[in-house]
Amino acid sequence: MKLTCVLIIAVLFLTACQLVTADYSGDEQQYRAMRLIDAMRNFGDTRSCGRRGKPCPCCRGFRCTGSFCRKWQ
């Protein structure tokens, strides 16, 4: 009887832990490098620049597309 109660409480506790942490992990990516690449991509897309075709002052390797900096390919 005691073992059954302990098992039920353990299962309920583990289920509650999973439900609590599930809300926080929905929008996160698993790998830090992927988050960094996405952050740099978003950072470059939101930086304003001067004239079209000129290097962006914010980031090395980015060029002005007319109004925003983008990675030069």
Swiss-Prot record:
The keyword Membrane does not apply. Residues 1-22 form the signal peptide. It is found in: Secreted. One of its GO terms (cellular component) is extracellular region. Its main location: secreted. Residues 23-47 form a propeptide. Expressed by the venom duct. Belongs to the conotoxin O1 superfamily. InterPro entries: Conotoxin. Keywords: Disulfide bond, Knottin, Neurotoxin, Secreted, Signal, Toxin. Disulfide bonds join C49-C59, C56-C64, C58-C69. It comes from Conus leopardus (Leopard cone). The presence of a 'disulfide through disulfide knot' structurally defines this protein as a knottin. The cysteine framework is VI/VII (C-C-CC-C-C). One of its GO terms (molecular function) is toxin activity. This is Conotoxin Leo-O2. It holds the Pfam family Conotoxin.
